[in-house]
Amino acid sequence: MVKVYAPASSANMSVGFDVLGAAVTPVDGALLGDVVTVEAAETFSLNNLGRFADKLPSEPRENIVYQCWERFCQELGKQIPVAMTLEKNMPIGSGLGSSACSVVAALMAMNEHCGKPLNDTRLLALMGELEGRISGSIHYDNVAPCFLGGMQLMIEENDIISQQVPGFDEWLWVLAYPGIKVSTAEARAILPAQYRRQDCIAHGRHLAGFIHACYSRQPELAAKLMKDVIAEPYRERLLPGFRQARQAVAEIGAVASGISGSGPTLFALCDKPETAQRVADWLGKNYLQNQEGFVHICQLDTAGARVLEN
């Protein structure tokens, strides 16, 4: 039996639409991510467990984990009879890389079960392909950090899909999921087809400056450059209370904030534990919409997807 855990991720990070993402893990040791178990069997089966299992498609073939198994078998050119279990701990349509968690855990577990026939680059390419079936287009800003850990910059040149960018140990990521769903496809459809020249220039300046600040170890500069002119101005209307929440967390002391992925999760970056706690308390009282919502204080998950049992 192989059991694989794949962590939540926060894509875009305001400054890097479709090209930046970070894997995150709660500082209290809780597992924020999905778990997939694979064991040898006579025929294929898939069992869904976990807090959000009831939100998965009722038709098994529509389940992305089934599609991962099917695509992996196709890649190897043979049927691999296994019993798979998905522990769906991540809310769907949350902006925390929920579909990436399931895809990464499923494909990594299948690869481990079969003795690692695929290398990491090929596996990551498959992960992007499968996750793209849900989000509507192939982009690696959730699957790459979820699989490899840390903060990842998408390269997609020279046979390199992504490379790690150094993060800052003192940064704490407060993630507030309000409990409502925003579909990635819907959030992409709301974006303009073309952008003004000054927005393109600002976006390039922010992203280049942010990467420079990470490598030159300037956390204050990096945080200041986490601005979004590409998606947030258009997407914030999908998120009730988002604008007020951003203002409030800035006043409390967050060094940056924005939409995690396509939302509705809000991320707030803090450089002191006491600030992070105050931000988390405010968001818990004011940004959550229902009982499904949650707030976690997280740090970068540098390990990425990992085998829990083998």
From Swiss-Prot:
Keywords: Amino-acid biosynthesis, ATP-binding, Cytoplasm, Kinase, Nucleotide-binding, Threonine biosynthesis, Transferase. It catalyses: L-homoserine + ATP = O-phospho-L-homoserine + ADP + H(+). It is found in: Cytoplasm. Its EC number is 2.7.1.39. Pathway: Amino-acid biosynthesis; L-threonine biosynthesis; L-threonine from L-aspartate: step 4/5. It comes from the Bacteria. One of its GO terms (biological process) is threonine biosynthetic process. One of its GO terms (molecular function) is homoserine kinase activity. GO terms for cellular component: cytoplasm. ATP binds at residues 91-101. Pfam families: GHMP_kinases_C, GHMP_kinases_N. The keyword Kinase applies. NCBIfam families: PRK01212.1-4 (NF002288), thrB (TIGR00191). PANTHER family: HOMOSERINE KINASE, HOMOSERINE/4-DIPHOSPHOCYTIDYL-2-C-METHYL-D-ERYTHRITOL KINASE. Belongs to the GHMP kinase family. Homoserine kinase subfamily. Catalyzes the ATP-dependent phosphorylation of L-homoserine to L-homoserine phosphate. This is Homoserine kinase.
